[in-house]
Amino acid sequence: MKKHLLALGLLLVGVSPAQALDVGDISSFMNSGSSTLSKTIKNSTDSGRLINIHLERLSSPLDGGQVIPMDKPDEVLLTPASLLLPAQASDVIRFFYKGPADDKERYYRIVWFDQALSDAQRDNANRSAVATASARIGTILVVAPRQVNYRFQYANGSLTNTGNATLRILAYGPCLKAADGKECKENYYLMPGKSRRFTQVDTANKKGRVALWQGEQFVPVK
């Protein structure tokens, strides 16, 4: 599974070591100009899987984030919420944002319950086996503000997000430490109000480059 984590630690519920369901990126972003998002999931095993999906709103995607009420019952819709996924098959799950069109960034945890189809069909006498053959996977959905305001400050190798939407920031160029090699690259997600210092790339070097993504727009910084 690709793991593009939010900076400072992404809240993630337990994932089985022998994960059968591939849900793609751990962090998914719905930009301000879009109200829909699609995620492709894949069953990489040789048996069918029963997949159930539900979504809950978080105060923050970072460690310590709490589940909080939705602003409205149909704030985010998804389809399908339950499906049978055959062996080595894939399917697309679609999410629809119907929430407030304001200046707040919103965070949601998508919880994927993955269960072997053979276990789901067993009778009550054998139901204890279901827990060991099931996985509960958590991924993050970030919905950018509908009234987005991208702003940032950069100084001395440190970027601060002074806007209201998460930025994807990157630096590349000569390594700061010789032990790291000649060329280094750093990528992070930077939430509103947070700062990040680049520690591997020598950003003071004239060949060092700093840039960021504002939604789908690439912005050179240095």
From Swiss-Prot:
Statement: the UniProt record of this protein carries the keyword NADP: no
Keyword Signal: yes
Protein name per Swiss-Prot or TrEMBL: Probable fimbrial chaperone EcpB
Regulation: induction: Positively regulated by EcpR.
Family: Belongs to the EcpB/EcpE family.
Gene name of the encoded protein: ecpB
Signal peptide coordinates: 1-20
InterPro entries documented for this protein: EcpB_C, Ig-like_fold, PapD-like_sf
Described purpose of this protein according to its UniProt entry: Part of the ecpRABCDE operon, which encodes the E.coli common pilus (ECP). ECP plays a dual role in early-stage biofilm development and host cell recognition.
Keywords from the named record: Chaperone, Fimbrium biogenesis, Signal
Highest rank taxon of the organism: Bacteria
Coiled-coil intervals, chain numbering: none
